[in-house]
A protein has these predicted regions:
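Short glycine-/polar-rich loops that comprise or flank the Walker A/P-loop
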Residues: 65-66, 106, 455-457, 482-484, ...
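Conserved P-loop NTPase
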Residues: 768-821
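Conserved P-loop NTPase motor cores
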Residues: 417-439, 443-450, 460-462, 466-468, ...
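Short secondary-structure boundary/capping segments
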Residues: 85-89, 124-129, 365-368, 474-479, ...
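A short, charged
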Residues: 433-457, 819-842
Length: 842
């Protein structure tokens, strides 16, 4: 048999009288204050973090006056993902890929209600759901003032653990504004757009609200609970990793249906509770002819002893789950909720005749309608453990990158740059990315750089292997050729640079080299890599080299016409004509010294000898880079091209890497130095990505330049990013460890299954905490770990088919798309045509 209640009946039955300045007042005279809580993200906390949250909540509850009801309400509702389209091809394809995808949203509300023993512990039969008339009895002004102060103190302690933030609910939140429903109307329509637009239908096993059937399960008896309520739920594979969630998380973020979790904690007068328990024990003892009574009497006695012995705080507790869905989904929903409760070791008890009471008690401000028969006496801290203490990934306002929440597979906006630095999670923007072969390293880097470019960043890539060919071509096409410059080295079109850009500022007032000048550091790195003394570079030989550079700058200032730049050939000739004759003595045919230099080259008032600095061998080593040398093109560009007016530039150096190793290293260093100039002079955020090409410069002579670049990048609103795939490369390279890894606050790791047996080395190298290690080992394919010192998370990487084709890095797989692009004259048309063909095939 069904009972139908009209909207008029419903509002007559409502336990609420009204809302005044954000305070809910019930018809029984109870007063409720509420907050919306912001919780930690799933897998964000360690076991200790959950303990801190539980203790903060328990301590806060102990501050409240006797007979205060705490109502913690978690609301999980479905929504559909909606993209923000801006006309950008790949961005819009990404949005279209996810458009309309259903996902769960979560909000948690916390209410405290000032009540009395008689009101809070009334019989279920007196619930508003059964048409009981209310007798008003409003609290005094002094009591309200004291309660408001206690509420402030309560929420201050709740948030003291720093894992939770709270926002006080306002009049508008509760009542709504205009056509926007407030929390009360939203609850009564089970979040289907309220206010309630249909009758409320009651049946023996369910309720129908609006077009949804609502089913309830309750935990209101001690026998329903496991022997001991755990602090947390442990999530893991049983061997390699272990992560933590709330004990009741199976009812929260892991329960895939629309539902509300209501937790009620009534803080009683402790003496009253013990007296009531003692009376109940004596009653049971007097009827010991029943074995059940004897067991109950012993359990009550043990509980009283534990309270006295351990100083425990008692409370009345109730928890229920109200879940709903369209007609015909009742059995599926019941199965999900029942399975979730069973996984917690909790007996699943369906709410039948008392379902209306539970529903009305969930109305904001109606917590005391729960009724005494639905409450059980328990220890406070254990019951607090049954609360939900995590939520889904949340969008970061103004976040740069869209990734996917790995639990819901919908995009969330995150930021590990400006916002992260503002929160003091990082001190620089530098990124170190490690992705073993097959982990999707190139795909993720393309995915990331596309979004950085769309956000207005200047992107500069040094690559080995054409990993960014498709993305660069697409950017070039969409920007009309302004951006997306793809430079591949070959003999006919070699790279050409000028090492003396900004040289006039290289000296201080005393005429000494300024060590903090990037141009100086670059030139020193170039020269010390191009040639090494037999005994290696030492402080004396380096001091001589610095003096030579300083003297060249003085000479160039005098001789190079204004507006022009010296080139490397000028430096080479300066060495030959003005430095070498002042160091190398004149010798006869037998090699005997005939005459010492007439004007010896002095450094620190001491003459430099060939033994101090073998300038002859030095000159011979540099001759390859002079105007007549085999690499004359590299450093002799008097009018260097503006390679960086493009906001997306790729230097592909695979052919270089297959040739002379020394020249390859020096060429990569020159490319990085060119970016250094852009970093210091271009406006906006700049990003340099060195993908595998870093191996060419991972040596001791270039380390000072790299360390300087990585350390100063922050000052120029820049990110230096290294991408690599081999763990051995990091372990074996002190340059990577000291110059790059230690100066990169952002660590990005892709699936590390291939490094599972050597993970201890990676853990030690990167200084990972136990929690970070567990997060990384929990990753599956197409997931990414992003760590910002102590703050970290794992995200799903999912993209549209169009993005996948643009980001493809394997030559055989991307060849058909690139060939089609050549035929059509458009890579975008080629991608669209290929996607449409794939769809037609099915």
């Amino acid at each position: 048999m069904e009972t139908v209640g009209t909207k008029r009946d419903l509002y007559w039955l409502m336990p609420l009288m009204g809302v005044d300045d954000g305070v809910i007042i019930s018809k029984r005279g109870e007063v409720t204050i509420g907050w919306e809580l912001s919780l930690p993200v799933v897998y964000d906390l360690t076991e200790e973090g959950y303990d801190e949250m539980v203790m903060a909540f328990a301590n806060a509850a102990k501050l409240l006056p006797a007979w205060t009801m705490i109502h913690r309400q978690d609301v999980f509702t479905y929504d559909q993902w909606k993209g923000e389209y801006d006309g950008n091809y790949l961005h819009d394809c990404f949005n279209a890929h996810f458009e309309g995808r259903r996902y769960l949203r979560h909000r948690q509300f916390l209410y405290i209600t000032m009540s009395s023993k008689g009101s809070a512990l009334k019989a279920n039969s007196q619930s508003a759901a059964f048409g009981i008339r209310f007798t008003a009895g409003f609290p005094k002004a002094q009591d309200l003032w004291m309660f408001a102060n206690k509420a402030d103190e309560f929420i201050s302690v709740v948030t003291s653990c720093l894992h939770v933030q709270a926002r006080r609910l306002t009049q508008e939140d509760i009542e709504g504004v205009g056509i926007e429903p407030g929390l009360v109307d939203s609850y009564l329509s089970v979040w289907q757009g309220g206010p309630l637009r249909s009758d409320l239908v009651l049946s023996p096993e369910s309720m129908r609200v609006f077009d949804n059937t609502l089913t309830g399960f309750k935990v209101s008896e001690a026998d329903d609970l496991p022997g001991e309520v755990p602090d947390v739920a442990r999530i893991g594979d049983g061997s390699s990793y272990e992560l933590f969630l709330s004990y009741s998380s199976a009812l929260g973020v892991r329960l895939d249906c629309e539902h509300v979790v209501n937790q009620y904690i009534l803080m009683p007068n402790q003496a009253d509770v013990l007296r009531d328990l003692d009376r109940k024990k004596k009653k049971m003892t007097s009827m010991q002819n029943s074995p059940e009574n004897r067991v109950n009497a012993k359990e009550i006695n043990d509980f009283i002893d534990a309270v006295h012995r351990d100083g425990m705080t008692t409370c009345y507790h109730h928890l229920n789950v109200l879940a709903w869905g369209p007609e015909g989904t009742e059995l599926e929903i019941k199965g999900k909720v029942s399975a979730a409760l069973s996984s917690m070791g909790v007996t699943a008890v369906q709410a039948l005749s008392d379902l209306p009471s539970l529903f009305f008690a969930g109305v904001p401000g109606g917590a005391c309608e729960i009724g005494k028969d639905n409450l059980m006496i328990q220890e406070l801290t254990s019951m607090v453990c049954m609360g939900l203490n995590e939520t889904f990934e949340k969008d970061v306002e103004g976040g740069l990158v869209l990734v996917s929440d790995r639990m819901r597979n919908v995009p969330v906006r995150i930021d590990f740059q400006r916002r992260a630095r503002a929160l003091k999670w990082i001190d620089n923007y530098n990124v170190f990315l490690l992705g073993p072969s097959g982990s999707g390293k190139s795909f993720f880097t393309n995915y990331f750089l596309q979004q950085c470019y769309d956000a207005g960043e200047h992107i500069f890539v040094i690559d080995v292997g054409d990993s960014y060919e498709g993305l660069c071509a697409l950017i070039n096409e969409s920007s009309g050729g302004r951006d997306g410059v793809y430079m591949t080295w070959d003999v006919e079109h070699p790279f050409s640079f000028n090492p003396f850009i900004g040289y006039t500022g290289w000296l201080d007032r005393q005429g000494n080299i300024r060590q903090d000048e990037s141009g100086v550091t670059f030139l020193m790195s170039f020269l010390t890599t191009a040639w090494k003394p037999a005994s290696g570079w030492n402080s004396d030989s380096l001091a001589i080299l610095e003096r030579i550079i300083a003297d060249f700058v003085v000479w160039a200032r005098r001789t190079v016409p204004p507006g022009e730049l010296p080139v490397f050939d000028d430096f080479y000739n300066f060495l030959v004509r003005q430095i070498a004759p002042r160091i190398i003595p004149v010798r006869d045919e037998k090699g005997e010294i005939v005459r010492l230099p007439e004007h010896p080259y002095l450094v620190g008032e001491l003459p430099v000898t060939p033994e101090d600095f073998d300038v002859g061998r030095f000159i011979r080593s540099l001759s390859s880079y002079s105007a007549t040398g085999s690499y004359s093109f590299l450093l002799n560009d008097k009018h260097p091209k503006d390679l960086f007016s493009s906001r997306f530039t790729v230097f592909e150096v695979l052919k270089l890497s297959e040739g002379n190793a020394l020249f390859y290293s020096l060429c990569v260093l020159c490319i990085m130095n060119a970016f250094d100039h852009k970093m210091r002079n271009a406006s906006g955020f700049k990003r340099m990505v060195v993908d595998e090409a870093w191996k060419a410069i991972a040596n001791e002579t270039m380390a000072p330049y790299l360390k300087g670049l990585w350390k100063t990048s922050r000052k120029y609103f820049c990110s230096a990013m290294v991408v690599t795939q081999e763990l051995d490369d990091i372990i074996s390279s002190d340059v990577i460890k000291e110059a790059i890894l230690m100066n990169s606050d952002i660590k990005v790791l892709l699936n590390q299954e291939k490094n599972a047996n050597r993970f201890g080395q990676l853990e030690s190298l990167m200084g990972l905490s136990e929690h970070q290690k567990n997060l990384i080992l929990s990753m599956k394919q197409y997931q990414v770990y992003i760590g910002m010192n102590k703050h970290c998370g794992v995200y799903q990487i999912e993209a549209s088919r169009q993005q996948a084709l643009a980001f493809e890095s394997e030559k055989e797989k991307k060849a058909p798309t690139l060939e089609r692009a050549r035929q059509l004259g458009s890579i975008r048309l080629a991608i669209d045509e290929q996607v449409n063909e794939e769809k037609s095939v099915g």
